[in-house]
Design a protein with these regions (language model features):
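Conserved catalytic cysteine-centered active-site region
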Residues: 1-15, 35-37, 49-56, 129-154
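Active-site pocket-shaping loop/turn-to-helix segments
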Residues: 1-4, 43-52, 70-77, 147-160, ...
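Glycine/threonine-rich beta-strand-loop-alpha-helix active-site module
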Residues: 12-44
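Beta-strand segments within the central parallel beta-sheet cores of soluble alpha/beta enzyme folds
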Residues: 18-24, 71-78, 96-101, 175-186, ...
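Short acidic, glycine/serine/threonine-rich loops at helix termini
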Residues: 28-34, 110-111, 192-195
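A glycine/threonine-rich phosphate-anchoring loop and its flanking beta-alpha core
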Residues: 35-70
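N-terminal extracellular/periplasmic Venus flytrap/periplasmic-binding protein-like
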Residues: 71-172
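Condensing-enzyme catalytic core of the thiolase-fold
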Residues: 85, 133, 161-183, 196-208
Length: 215
């Protein structure tokens, strides 16, 4: 959405250059979620899936669209392999800006916690030693489900930003154009399958730009 705001402002001539960014901090949500007004009984009775956990929606989508546990695990192995190869080739070296911060570290033996200085300079999520055998040995989070700690999204904080500029200005300044903005679209689905909302959004965006998946 931030990128869309900047792109539209450039297209309207309001600005010629802008920065779009976003941040997600799961560490601020896990133990500090404000539950005031969180539950609304009439809606809960009518659409209980609004309050489903991510695990519940993931298992529901996997069952509805016939995605097996094996399918999920194989995709994870492929994804981990790709990111490991990209890291080894230095593909992300120019995209990650190191910065210093403090991190809370808890000693497993004593249970004591302390703040230490750290420099974040790489994505800590990838697990290059992931194998189908290791994933297959993990138990599902929910009984009878397909979601495990190995094939689910990780819990981590992250932030990203991109500089957007009018093409003529970029050319005038001799800056390399890494990509072009073609449009933005939103999609919506039922709460129980929220994880596939990107699908109708992509289809809408392709239709707006008169392209198909083959293009």
């Amino acid at each position: 959405s931030a990128a869309s705001f900047v792109a539209n402002a450039i297209a309207r001539g309001e600005i010629s250059c802008g920065m779009a960014g976003g941040v997600e901090s799961i560490s601020l949500v896990q133990f500090n979620l404000n539950f005031n007004g969180f539950f609304y009984e009439p809606l809960q009775q009518m659409m209980p899936a609004v309050w489903w956990t991510m695990n519940q929606t993931a298992d529901f989508v996997a069952e509805r669209y016939q995605i097996s546990r094996r399918d999920l695990d194989e995709y994870v192995v492929m994804s981990q392999k790709r990111v490991a190869e990209a890291n080894a080739a230095g593909k992300y070296a120019d995209e990650i800006v190191p910065f210093a911060t403090k991190m809370k570290v808890t000693d497993k033996a004593s249970g004591q916690s302390s703040m230490v200085d750290v420099t974040l300079d790489h994505d800590e999520g990838p697990r290059p030693d992931t194998t189908i055998e290791k994933l297959s040995a993990l138990k599902p989070v929910l009984e009878g489900g397909t979601t495990t700690a190995g094939n689910a999204s990780q819990l981590s904080d992250g932030a990203a930003a991109v500089v957007m500029m009018d093409a003529e200005l970029a050319a005038k300044r001799g800056l390399p154009i890494l990509g072009y903005w073609r449009g933005f679209a939103l999609g919506s689905v039922a709460p129980e399958e929220m994880s596939i909302a990107i699908t109708p959004a992509i289809r809408k965006l392709m239709k707006l730009n008169a392209v198909n998946a083959g293009d």
